[in-house]
């Protein structure tokens, strides 16, 4: 269970990371929407797992490669934004959040019709 401090830091990081990725998408990936779907900080506040979703979905792999290569630059940009709220910036791990793709697949299956497996 997350502490109140973890929840506050998750929220702070998510808001600021969204701004960082908005600028990054405009500069490096025009026409691509990068969304910070969630951030989970460990109890010791040393590691933050950042879950990103991309639209269009076919640009996910290329964008994730770019983000992994430029992780120090992204962390530095984040540190500049939250330097007055956090003493130490957690290490950041990036993961592609495929929940949008999963939802799109479910929508497609429902639209196609077919037999309902739940009766």
Residue ranges and their predicted role:
Residues 1-47, 51-119:
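Charge-rich, low-complexity N-terminal segments
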């Amino acid at each position: 269970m997350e502490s109140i401090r973890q929840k506050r830091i998750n929220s702070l990081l998510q808001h600021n990371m969204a701004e960082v990725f908005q600028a990054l998408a405009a500069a490096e990936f025009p026409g691509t929407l990068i969304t910070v779907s969630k951030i989970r900080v460990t109890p010791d506040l040393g590691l933050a797992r950042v879950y990103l979703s991309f639209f269009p979905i076919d640009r996910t792999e290329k964008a994730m490669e770019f983000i992994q290569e430029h992780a120090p630059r992204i962390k530095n940009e984040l540190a500049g934004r939250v330097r007055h709220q956090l003493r130490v910036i957690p290490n950041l791990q990036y993961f592609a959040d495929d929940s949008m793709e999963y939802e799109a697949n479910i929508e497609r299956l429902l639209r196609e019709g077919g037999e309902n497996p739940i009766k």
